[in-house]
């Protein structure tokens, strides 16, 4: 899911667990649009593909299962993560609304 209003990119906690990615606690927390707070853990990714795009190694926030489930229910499909403004900016994201396509460099 592309969320241009999200400052950061998040991965689904269940996906992170399934891929056996180690997580690290932080002192930060975040909240959803209803004010539900969740601790902000991070996972270091080294080899992740988004379609044909190879995402460079970096640390990404982990979205708690509760918040991820809410987003999936609203979207009526499973959400594996949110692409936020941080990734869209650093990877020069272009959103083509006519073809509903996302291009990353």
What are these regions (language model features)?
Residues 1-105:
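Pepsin/retropepsin-fold aspartyl endopeptidases
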